[in-house]
């Protein structure tokens, strides 16, 4: 029996950041991981996807070469080199996490860990005991129960990241973040991309106006969208779906299922520890503690917010709670980004949410086409919406366009400090920068 102050199951962003924070504050930590350090985000999610998106962005710029005075520009897309660059990025960051797991106070154990009881974990036949346990096992791709889902040409985002060549025809089932990012990237790589989505609009967590404008912009680049369409079956290269009461089909060489993710709750021994959970995730309170005192669940596995940075900050919160330290993290101010081209980002409430909750709110817009830096960059397609209460306190910000994530991040900081629109008006912004778009929106109040 090995005793330690804190056990963490899972070495993704939530797990390894929690371990680092705890070790820096003098706790002995044992981290268990049955795959690769870094979790889904680093190995088969955020990071490799963003590497591909960057390649796609460069290709899009090359196609606009004549607008920059680059006449008769020629280039050849070598997807193998694109994949190799993506893998180098992943391996560099993974090496950094591996090094982090060797810092004083952290013991890193490779293998599948299960709870024996509320204080004991078993891995590789060895038992480990701690007064506090953090479960950070993440999530996996959710597969829809339809005929043909098990075909070799039907893949999840994990498998799509490892394809050796660009598919001539790619059908994406689902227009959430994963589906939209891959639609944007593979369209740039040369695929004929079709997206089939059950809902009325793409990116349901995004402001509906922003989501519609983004979809329309991506459509202009050749991506075909079928909204309010339910997939019925897959047979060979044929995807059959129903839309507006009519059955339709689309042909594809590769079919990506991007219908969301589900928490990894199986095979952890949660029942033995008496933890309340369901297939929708582990139930936690405001401190991310389960019904069993001393056992916490952070990140995708609690399904509160399936974002890597959400997992990290939930982990910081938990460690501070264990240490008895005050925690001022504003979890309700959770920015997110979609790295399509152009990209989109969001924080806080949308206009629709304000209306649904009966909140008197004011919304003002600022357009990229009126910004000097956007014009100089030839990135004039974009919009930023700023939403505030009648007293001026900022409730949300939603944008699409070049570097939208960076613009929304500024507003996230302001929201964490309960900044008002009038206070934002008094903050000097560098000229010419895209950040002036945020200020322009404030000046419209």
Q: Model-derived features: where do they sit?
A:
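Flexible, glycine-rich terminal cap/loop adjacent to redox cofactors
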Residues: 7-35, 40, 47, 51-58, ...
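Short hydrophobic core segments
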Residues: 7-9, 113, 128-138, 173, ...
């Amino acid at each position: 029996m090995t005793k330690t102050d804190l056990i963490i199951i899972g070495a993704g962003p939530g797990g390894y950041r929690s371990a680092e924070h705890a070790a820096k504050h003098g706790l002995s930590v044992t981290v268990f991981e049955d795959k690769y350090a870094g979790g889904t985000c680093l190995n088969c999610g955020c990071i490799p996807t963003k590497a591909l998106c960057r390649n796609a962005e460069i290709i899009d710029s090359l196609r606009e070469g004549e607008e920059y005075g680059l006449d008769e520009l020629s280039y050849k897309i070598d997807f193998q080199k694109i994949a190799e660059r993506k893998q180098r990025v992943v391996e560099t960051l993974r090496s950094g996490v591996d090094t982090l797991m060797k810092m004083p106070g952290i013991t890193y154990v490779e293998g599948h860990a299960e709870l024996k009881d509320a204080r004991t974990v078993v891995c590789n036949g060895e038992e480990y005991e701690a007064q506090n346990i953090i479960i950070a096992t993440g999530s996996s791709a959710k597969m829809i129960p339809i005929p043909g889902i098990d075909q070799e040409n039907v893949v999840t985002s994990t498998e799509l990241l490892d394809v050796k060549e660009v598919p001539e025809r790619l059908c994406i089932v689902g227009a959430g973040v994963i589906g939209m990012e891959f639609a944007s990237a593979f369209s740039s790589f040369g695929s004929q991309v079709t997206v089939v989505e059950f809902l009325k609009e793409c990116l349901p967590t995004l402001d509906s106006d922003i989501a519609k404008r983004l979809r329309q912009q991506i459509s202009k680049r050749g991506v075909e969208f079928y909204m309010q369409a339910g997939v019925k079956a897959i047979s060979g290269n044929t995807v059959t779906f129903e839309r507006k009461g009519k059955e339709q089909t689309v042909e594809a060489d590769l079919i990506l299922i991007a219908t969301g993710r589900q928490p990894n709750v199986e095979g952890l021994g949660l029942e033995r520890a008496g933890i309340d959970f369901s297939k929708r995730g582990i139930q936690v309170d405001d401190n991310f503690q389960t019904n069993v005192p001393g056992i916490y669940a952070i990140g995708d596995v609690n399904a509160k917010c399936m974002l890597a940075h959400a997992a990290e900050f939930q982990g910081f919160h938990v460690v501070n709670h264990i240490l008895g330290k005050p925690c001022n993290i504003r979890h309700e101010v959770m920015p997110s980004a979609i790295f399509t081209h152009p990209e989109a980002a969001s924080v806080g409430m949308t206009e629709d949410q304000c209306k649904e909750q009966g909140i008197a709110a004011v919304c003002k817009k600022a357009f990229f086409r009126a910004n000097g830096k956007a014009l100089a960059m030839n990135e004039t397609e974009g919009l930023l919406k700023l939403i505030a209460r009648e007293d001026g306190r900022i409730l949300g910000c939603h944008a699409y366009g070049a570097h939208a994530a960076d613009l929304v991040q500024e507003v996230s900081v302001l929201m964490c400090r309960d900044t008002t629109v009038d206070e934002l008006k008094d903050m000097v912004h560098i000229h010419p920068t895209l950040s002036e778009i945020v200020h322009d929106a404030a000046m419209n109040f």
